[in-house]
Amino acid sequence: MQCMAVHQFAPLLSLLNCSRISSDFGRLFTPKTSTKSRSSTCHPIQCTVVNNTDRRSANYEPSIWSFDYIQSLTSQYKGKSYSSRLNELKKEVKMMEDGTKECLAQLDLIDTLQRLGISYHFEDEINTILKRKYINIQNNINHNYNLYSTALQFRLLRQHGYLVTQEVFNAFKDETGKFKTYLSDDIMGVLSLYEASFYAMKHENVLEEARVFSTECLKEYMMKMEQNKVLLDHDLDHNDNFNVNHHVLIINHALELPLHWRITRSEARWFIDVYEKKQDMDSTLLEFAKLDFNMVQSTHQEDLKHLSRWWRHSKLGEKLNFARDRLMEAFLWEVGLKFEPEFSYFKRISARLFVLITIIDDIYDVYGTLEELELFTKAVERWDVNAINELPEYMKMPFLVLHNTINEMAFDVLGDQNFLNIEYLKKSLVDLCKCYLQEAKWYYSGYQPTLQEYIEMAWLSIGGPVILVHAYFCFTNPITKESMKFFTEGYPNIIQQSCLIVRLADDFGTFSDELNRGDVPKSIQCYMYDTGASEDEAREHIKFLICETWKDMNKNDEDNSCFSETFVEVCKNLARTALFMYQYGDGHASQNCLSKERIFALIINPINFHERK
């Protein structure tokens, strides 16, 4: 299989010229914002005098997560007794898999394992089942699946890299080429079709039609349920009422964000509660999911405490009070990227990068003068610790911490794989700082970029390439010349596309706050300026670009032979985590109630757990 070509901007800029289709794919990023800020942590810009230089301030509030609080986190879910119980449950689930022979039951079990967040324990078994099903499809072995099972099998196979044809859904169309109207009566089948449609690639019109059809059906169902809510509560028996309420809950969740775009850990935390209330839930699966969640959470707490000690030792939070201190939020990004406990090193070191990128972003975006920013950019290009002497005082410490962190990462890769990657890590940082500098020049000159000019810079200035270049070296062994050429020539398409989604999601969630701060125009403003569109129209266009970029990432599944499956999945997880972080506003900078609830649910509070007797 040929490796994918690297075109520095072509895959992204082609989005700007593609023909417009409906972007109504649910309720992504709800509720919609107005131009009024939703954040309680950002205030109008104020200027303070520092060394006779007028500097902007975003007035970010200090972190609410103190060092002492983080260090006090404890979990009972560690040690041999819990590990032994988990292994016992794992054996029971394995027996359940082996004993499930009926095709639909196998698919449902795989889907449940994934949504409960425990499928990573059974990857080999799942791959064996799906490979067998794909071979059956290739051999035209027909199981006469209904809409639900056809869509479920399609989604699971595409998710695992099997390029099943979209034509399987033509069986559910009428003689005019439209999906049969009676399908709307099978609401769970329609939901399954909806989830499958988000694995579409460019020009897959059947899946595009499936998305539009299923979205309309699901919204109509939700409207009907809302109108008939009182009637349903009184006229249905307990079992039917439960099923209806369960369907409403699942459908509403899907319309907010499709399953393909959600991070595993957050979905697991939500679905465990939903699954527990199902009448046909399996108590073994439920106990396994709860125990595994809590045990993994205990490893996350240890990683977080390690990160907190590094942060305190760096003293950056004390010295740079103009910048965001968002250690906890940075770690939450890492939980989205790779939650499994065996990847503690990656979470710990990558979270440092998130923290440092946030600080450097605030230096360029808010605090530094243009002359100072040019000095910092040159220092990063030189990558010489002596360059610190040419920097203003407040820049010296962040430069030194960045320099030491990157060198430490390079040292680790050299020791593990005998490969010196410092030039590649440095290149990603230089690209980042140059983009930051260009955006600062736009700000100081009052320049209004076009959307095309903005995107050329913005997918890099979001900082994602720095994280993903590091991820490549963490999840690639051995490192090959074939794959390294992509980083020599530019960046692989999968990185560009992932980072574009991160940027667009960021813009969508932070637009109102950044508008109040007077920051550089973002994608929404650029589109409004280019076309004369309203804010609502611009938001719809950004949602459309996100959807189209996902189609490009879906297509890359057939072109990623140069990269490990783990690395490709981390790239996609970065995009998913951005959609999670910015779904309801600025989940990175704003310490609002929803952000705190998510952190408590995923990192701090265990799930109520009782071992079966």
Swiss-Prot record:
Residues where Mg(2+) 2 binds: D361, D365
Superkingdom of origin organism: Eukaryota
Topology versus the membrane: Single-pass membrane protein
Binding-site list for Mg(2+) 1: D361, D365
TM annotation in the entry: 455-475
EC category name: lyase
Entry keyword Lyase: yes
Reactions catalysed: (2E)-geranyl diphosphate = beta-myrcene + diphosphate
Sample GO molecular function, one term: myrcene synthase activity
Binding note for cofactor: Binds 3 Mg(2+) or Mn(2+) ions per subunit.
Entry note about domains: The Asp-Asp-Xaa-Xaa-Asp/Glu (DDXXD/E) motif is important for the catalytic activity, presumably through binding to Mg(2+).
Protein name, as recorded: Myrcene synthase, chloroplastic
Organism of origin: Humulus lupulus (European hop)
